[in-house]
Swiss-Prot record:
Tissue: Expressed by the venom gland.
Note on cofactor: Binds 1 Ca(2+) ion.
Residues of the active site: 63, 105
Cofactors: Ca(2+)
Subcellular location: Secreted
Sequence similarity: Belongs to the phospholipase A2 family. Group II subfamily. D49 sub-subfamily.
Protein name, UniProt field: Basic phospholipase A2 PL-Y
Organism field: Protobothrops flavoviridis (Habu)
Any one cellular-component term (Gene Ontology): extracellular region
Keyword Signal: yes
Disulfide bond entries: 42-131, 44-60, 59-111, 65-138, 66-104, 73-97, 91-102
More details: Negative results: does not induce edema.
GO biological process, one term: lipid catabolic process
């Protein structure tokens, strides 16, 4: 299912903040997010179940949990404002909802950066049918 979602995003073009999130990840990690994170582990990309496979996958789990707390806007499609100041992501704007979304994305991008040393290529295209452990709660 998450493969279809990612392909749909690629075919229609990235709108809203997904492009912003991609840029944040690229800036923090130097990796191309669609290749490196879109199908990583059990939680990166669309959906998620089971137990995160490693620290990078846990970044995605925490990001999903962060999005679950967002109310009043659509975390995947609404634009937010951010800037880079001395290499740091600074979320801005007057809309409290989109600012929270930006903070969720910022935390995930930093988490990916902080866990680059434990990133495992074997989880890059991990089939979600192997995510069979009990699903953790946020």
């Amino acid at each position: 299912m998450r493969t279809l979602w990612i392909m749909a995003v690629l075919l229609v073009g990235v709108e809203g903040h997904l492009l912003q999130f991609r840029k944040m990840i690229k800036k923090m990690t130097g990796k191309e997010p669609i290749v490196s994170y879109a199908f990583y582990g059990c939680y990166c990309g669309k959906g998620g179940r089971g137990k995160p496979k490693d620290a990078t996958d846990r970044c995605c789990f925490v990001h999903d949990c962060c999005y679950e707390k967002v109310t009043g806007c659509d975390p995947k499609w609404d634009y937010y404002t951010y800037s880079l100041e001395n290499g740091d992501i600074v979320c801005g704007g007057d809309n409290p909802c989109t600012k929270v979304v930006c903070e969720c994305d910022k935390a995930a991008a930093i988490c990916f950066r902080d866990n680059l040393k434990t990133y495992k290529k074997r989880y890059m295209t991990f089939p979600d049918i192997f995510c069979t452990d009990p699903t953790e709660k946020c």
